[in-house]
Amino acid sequence: MGYPFRALEKKWQAYWRDKRVFCVSEDERFPPERRAYVLDMFPYPSAQGLHVGHPEGYTATDIYCRYLRMGGYNVLHPMGFDAFGLPAENFALKTGTHPRVSTSANCDTFRRQIQSFGFSYDWEREISTADPEYYRWTQWLFLKLYEKGLAYEATAPINWCPSCKTGLANEEVRDACCERCGAEVTRRGVRQWMVRITAYAERLLSDLDELDWPESVKQMQRNWIGKSCGAEIDFPVDAPACSVHDKLPQTIRVYTTRADTLFGVTYLVLAPEHEAVTALTTHAQRAAVQAYVQRAAKKNDLERTDLAKEKTGVFTGAYVRNPINDMRIPVWVGDYVLVSYGTGAVMAVPAHDQRDWDFATRFGLPKLTVVSADYTATVPNSNSPQGAVLQRCVSDEGFVVNSGAFNGLASADARERIVAHLEMRGAGARRVTYRLRDWVFSRQRYWGEPIPLVHCPSCGVVPLPESALPLLLPETADFTPTEDGQGPLARARTWLRVPCPQCASDAVRETNTMPQWAGSCWYYLRYMDPRNKTAFCAPEKERYWAPVALYVGGAEHAVLHLLYARFWHKVLYDLGLVSTKEPFARLVNQGMITSYAYRRKNGALVPHDEVHTNAQGTYVHARTGEKLECVVAKMSKALKNVVNPDDMIAAYGADACRVYEMFMGPLEASKPWNTQGLVGVFRFLEKIWVLAGRVAAANGIPQDSRAEPPGDLHAQKKSCSMYALETLLHRTIQKVTDDTSALSFNTAISQMMIFVNEATRVARRMPLPSKMWEMFVKILSPYAPHLAEELWEMCGHTHTIAYEPWPQVDPARVAPHVCSVVVQVNGKVRDTFSVAPNAPNEELEQKARETAGARKFLGTQQPKRVVIVPNKLVNFVL
């Protein structure tokens, strides 16, 4: 009989479900070190369903969880759905269905597909962020932020997506476009709710060092937080040069990390949104400045700071004085300066900053050299009597020049001295700033958590009492976004108008909704206690499971979900609601599973159905006959190269798909899908099935194959073969144990393939002992659980293999036959030699002396002492 994978998978998935095999509780018999919370980043349920890339991370965590259970761990492994947000709402708008209906249907599809892989999730803990019983606690947690002063209302220029008709956080903008729909983002002033994530910037930065995360992700967060140590410097306004204005500031404050270049400032640049622009602008320059400010308002931050674009600006007509030397310098407006960073004003040092150089070159402004690689008394400048000698900007540090009493100091020393001088005069002060901006926490859309606040004419903003939660989304047929930035909830008149919770007068509800990230900031906590109606999570359950021991998901969430969740968690920690400072102890980013695509000479990719293979085996365009290059690309509906897991499971089975996805390469690496590789893995499982049949047919086989070889030569050869196979099994167990612990699944599978090939060869000549076979089935079970359960039952067992103890290795069988010993002379490697394990020190020293390297570097000298590390090292100290 062939390998009946369809019947096996249906049988064992029903068994796991009906027997509640993977439902877990807070069993106190497991000590803290034997508890593990393993989590996948939960999916948002798109209409397209899963493609074969989605289950990669899910398969990895499932293998790891099954391995831990067999190792005696109590494992929490849940799954749910990130169901609120723009993707779900945009699909509903496109299809004309209500998002509640379409999202529910999409969740059903995702659940069916995920379950078809046989993942060992505790489905009784399933959550959905769009479930009122869930978002009740999202609203409750938001109110905690509000009470703590971390949520506030503001009208400010934000990233606006004209297609999605909503504001976007900086983290949701990619290359000046909306991350979700790809539309070009503009700037727009909209009333928003903001969350003060900047209050936690330093802790978010410093605590990264404690996390077992990929260094690349930690560095992305460090860069996004963008800590900068510098100084704020006040430039007095030269009042006579400015137009008369009742709000004329006395000084313009700038932030700089290069106070050592203060003598080289030749102009100031204000962001177009800077509050002093109007007051500083002279009458003669007013029209030009106003026109420039209006043009700048249409650009997003990425456009404005693009180094490749030509700098633009306009002179205000105003001047300020340099506080270090009283030089009179002009004030310009330039959109390459952002009001959201530093003070919204920069001191321009074109000789030592490339952006300032480009700006000065464009507008003919002077460039003063004040830092030199080698100190000399004077260095000519572009406006010096010697003429224009500067050919390029030099941003490196060095020694300050043309800087009065500070000449000759190294840049770092000059910074300290100049800032101290300014502080003494009250013209400056040291300051730490961060690139991180407060989080835009509201969306002008329908499908999200309603914000539980009321606007009262008398009382202002009033939070809803806890008894009024959850504040439900109103049922409405018209959920299309508006153009005025108010949001669809403003049209729900009955829902909108409500008595003020504080004074009972007429009030209106907040019409913005929360962003998709709100529900995903804390979902890992709800899994610990998903049915609790009196708290988001009981403290004793949080203490039992926290923190998440292993979190697996995409690196694209580095400065979105992962940063937001860390911030949210730290707030909860400060409120005494969680017991750990960080939510995720270890993070692993799985690589992307890509697909093959075909590229024309002009770089355009061609859909699969337009590609043919000619008689020479070359890929050609079906219509034009043009030769095509086969490349690796992201799976795309447009390219028609998306691989549906339903089709693969139907043809080859869930176990084959699981094993193949892990066998493709290292978990963290991107790799292309190749169905022929899946066929190869399917044949591997078929081979195991055939081998199992041989074992089952050999009833009454001896359980101990380790007896001494008998005298009969033929029997002796058979016994030696079995001994060698058992040795290979123990080495396989060791390899699979080590690699599964390290999430190196591809090499574990390779080792199992080696064992199966050898076991198949041996089994043709003699029966395999059932004890040996059962040990192999155990290590196979995390990888191919359906097949392993059936093989376990064939061995005569009536209970699941899922909680069987992981097989132990016989140390004698895995010890190396020889050791490689390093020979050093005075700590430097000079040679190596091989020796039997645990050789005595006398033998190690003698063999080391006999090596060519030792003879060359010792010569006739006698070492003062010999340092020996058994099995590893001999070091001669002269």
Swiss-Prot record:
The keyword Phosphoprotein does not apply. Its main location: cytoplasm. Disulfide bonds: none annotated. It catalyses: tRNA(Leu) + L-leucine + ATP = L-leucyl-tRNA(Leu) + AMP + diphosphate. A motif ('HIGH' region) lies at residues 43-54. This is Leucine--tRNA ligase. It comes from Treponema pallidum (strain Nichols). Belongs to the class-I aminoacyl-tRNA synthetase family. Keywords: Aminoacyl-tRNA synthetase, ATP-binding, Cytoplasm, Ligase, Nucleotide-binding, Protein biosynthesis.
